[in-house]
Regions:
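Extracellular/periplasmic helix-exit of transmembrane alpha-helices
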Residues: 321-337, 392-470, 507, 552-557
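Membrane-interface "cap" regions at the ends of multi-pass membrane proteins
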Residues: 16-37, 70-124, 307, 346-347, ...
Length: 703
């Protein structure tokens, strides 16, 4: 009896202690997250309110870290539990439809790496660098807020909705959930937008590599390296992933190191020093080869190689920023907030938002979130980490790009990014113009910097990529090796950027080719077969020719091409995000969770305001530096030459493309709103086309 009484007492005491332990853990969690919130609020306040004196880049790092941590812990969890209702017991298409080729149950960290490598393109590197002409403040605030409340949300919900529909694409989901008309228009819009995105990605690579023998040699060598890796893994040593990884890594380092000797040899340097038009031709040939060749031969090994380079370099850059903790030289806001900026014309609203694009929200991501990634997810609960988390990682890259651009002296930043048509062709004239804006720089300073990084000149290197490379080389050389290695770090950065972007170029061309083949297959069945080479070659040529035309337009533009094509890129990208959010909102309303629809409706409303305003300005603004039609009219009033007549046609074409995209997205929006109103009024049946529930065989692993 005594023993029983003692046991009951001990049991009660144990429960009492366990209760207090849990309570203490809860209090510690609350205090910990409160501290994160307070530190984050302090960092954001410092960034937003500090005026008249430079701030340390660590404030941006701290603000970003806190915002991402809070967003992932609380906002993504709210979405996962209240809106999407993630179910760890539900089998994913990777499990149900596993075929070892397209559908394959894959480790969540491998899926995360694949997804990040696939979505991380030119946007987070280039957009924030270009937008830095407004100062560091606008870009930083939009990257943080846009990623947490818009970009990560879009990627997460589209990924989960695709997983629940057997990995269907965005356009297929649009057809199923919005209707046939909305689906058809969405398909046409996606193809059109993809062409613009690929053209601009190619233009950035061209601008980064033109007149750079070191950079071009390094990138050119990655093609035979990728081919060798593909053959080695497929034919020579099948399955030896670690061997081929080590081999590829060593060869890439050798290519970077060897590039400096190529640049110092007059004969070899002349071979690898090419003009922008020549590079444009070569990159279109590469795009065709990457789309038409077997995926194991070039695309897969290059993507595999670039994934290691991307993740490793981003990690090193983050460490470099923390170690160096540089001061931002760019002011919070510059004089160019009035829309007269030399990098691109236009006021902060809406142009800062469409310029930053992918660093905050990217429509292109919705194609990946409804493409290969949902076919690899092992469990629904992993979509939160992959969808929301990978976009946070890309947003962190955008913050690093802002730091890289803003640690330079503003005069150097504008000398690199301003086109010759704005500041002048001669170095002395360009330096005088930029100094006249209040950002001192001399031709001698620029020549010394060019010599330090192993380039002939850094004036008028538009496109954002060269400026990012200079900033990145500055951070690395001052924190990881000394200034004597600045040239090596600069060309490593160029190689990193080109690999970063070429991954999007070759994968995007292949995705577009698949979409075109799928459409043509309805007209003639063999054209839809992805294994039939006449169809492969024909559709690859069609897609490469389409984006190659816009690339050619950009390289022949006397204002650097980026002035006209990057706004078109930003508008197209954000319009694609608008389509994705229309689909997401429709599904949320159909699943009887309309009270939570603001999670996607709020970013949708913001994107509509931004993209429609930007589109209107790009078409009809009377300022020739802003409006396509105004520039065409101004050129037509001057003496017409072959070059000006081509520019007139291109500007009118850009205006027409913008208008057509706007109309198509408007139609998708109208069809979506009709669905929403009908469902909320009870006039339409709220039926979603999800795959039936099947219990996963991994149920015992639920946690």
């Amino acid at each position: 009896m005594v023993a029983r009484t003692l046991g009951v007492a001990l049991s009660a005491e144990f429960r009492h202690n366990a209760h207090w332990i849990e309570l203490m853990k809860k209090i510690i969690r609350i205090l910990g997250w409160s501290a994160v919130a307070l530190v984050g609020a302090g960092a954001v306040s410092t960034i937003a309110l500090r005026r008249g004196e430079p701030i340390n880049a660590l404030w941006l790092v701290v603000a970003a870290t806190c915002c991402y941590a809070l967003g992932y812990r609380f906002y993504s969890k709210f979405i996962a539990t209240k809106i999407l209702v993630l179910d760890g017991l539900r089998a994913t298409p990777a499990e149900r439809l596993e075929n070892g080729r397209d559908f394959l149950v894959t480790n969540k960290w491998v899926v995360f790496g694949h997804h990040f490598a696939a979505i991380a393109g030119p946007g987070p590197l280039v957009g924030p660098v270009l937008a830095a002409q407004f100062g560091y403040l606008p870009g930083t605030m939009w990257v943080l807020a846009g990623a947490v409340f818009a970009g990560c949300v879009q990627d997460f919900v589209i990924l989960l909705f695709s997983v629940r529909r057997d990995g269907k694409s965005l356009t297929e989901m649009a057809k199923d959930e919005i209707g046939r008309i909305g689906g058809f228009v969405a398909y046409a819009a996606v193809i059109s937008i993809l062409i613009i995105l690929l053209a601009v990605a190619a233009l950035i690579v061209v601008n980064a590599l033109k007149a750079s023998s070191w950079g071009l040699f390094t990138i050119a060598m990655t093609i035979p390296i990728a081919l060798l890796m593909g053959v080695y893994l497929r034919r020579i040593r099948p399955g030896k992933v670690l061997e081929v990884s080590a081999l590829g890594f060593v060869m890439v380092l050798a290519a970077i190191w060897g590039g400096q000797y190529v640049s110092q040899n007059a004969g070899l340097a002349s071979v690898f020093t090419l003009s922008a038009p020549a590079l444009a031709i070569l990159i279109t040939v590469y795009g065709f080869a990457a789309s038409a060749l077997p995926v194991w031969l070039l695309l897969a090994p290059r993507d595999y190689l670039s994934t290691f380079v991307k993740l490793g370099t981003i990690g090193l850059l983050g460490i470099g920023i923390v170690v160096l903790h540089p001061t931002l030289q760019m002011p919070a806001l510059t004089r160019f907030v009035d829309g007269t900026g030399p990098v691109f014309a236009g006021k902060i609203f809406p142009f800062a938002f469409i310029t930053i694009a992918c660093g905050a929200i990217s429509g292109f991501h919705s194609l990946i979130s409804s493409g290969t990634t949902p076919k690899l997810i092992a469990r629904e609960t992993e979509t939160r980490m992959v969808g929301y988390g990978a976009m946070m990682a890309e947003s962190a890259v955008a913050i690093m790009a802002i730091v890289a651009a803003c640690v330079m002296q503003p005069g150097i930043y504008f000398a690199i990014n301003s086109p010759a048509g704005i500041v002048g062709q001669a170095p002395a004239a360009a330096a005088a113009t930029i100094s006249g804006w209040g950002f001192p720089v001399t031709a001698g300073e620029m020549q010394a910097l060019a010599h330090a990084v192993g380039e002939q000149t850094l004036f008028n290197r538009t496109g954002g990529a060269p400026a990012f490379a200079v900033g990145m080389a500055h951070i690395f050389s001052h924190s990881l090796g000394g200034e004597t290695l600045m040239a090596l770090w600069y060309h490593f950065a160029i190689m990193f950027e080109a690999l970063f972007i070429l991954t999007i170029l070759d994968a995007g061309t292949r995705v577009a080719r698949f979409m075109v083949q799928d459409a043509l297959g309805h007209l003639y069945e063999p054209l839809g077969r992805t294994s039939w080479y006449p169809s492969i070659l024909g559709t690859s040529a069609l897609m490469v020719g389409a984006w190659g035309y816009f690339l050619w337009q950009g390289v022949k533009d006397p204002l650097g091409g980026i002035n006209s094509l990057w706004p078109l890129f930003g508008i197209s990208n954000q319009l694609l995000a608008t389509v994705a959010l229309c689909v997401a909102t429709t599904i949320i309303i159909k699943t009887h969770r309309a009270k939570y629809a603001a999670v996607t409706l709020a970013p949708l409303a913001w994107l509509l305001a931004v993209t429609f305003t930007a589109s209107w300005h790009k078409m009809f603004d009377p300022n020739p530096r802003v409006g396509f039609l105004a520039q065409a009219q101004a050129l037509a009033a001057a003496p017409v030459t072959g070059a000006t007549s081509r520019l007139i046609f291109n500007n009118r074409l850009d205006a027409a493309v913008t208008g057509v995209l706007l109309i198509m997205v408007t139609l998708v929006l109208v069809e979506s709103v009709r669905q929403w109103i009908g469902i909320l009024r009870g006039a339409r049946e709220a039926r979603v086309k999800e795959s039936p529930f099947v219990r996963t065989r991994f149920a015992e692993e639920r946690g």
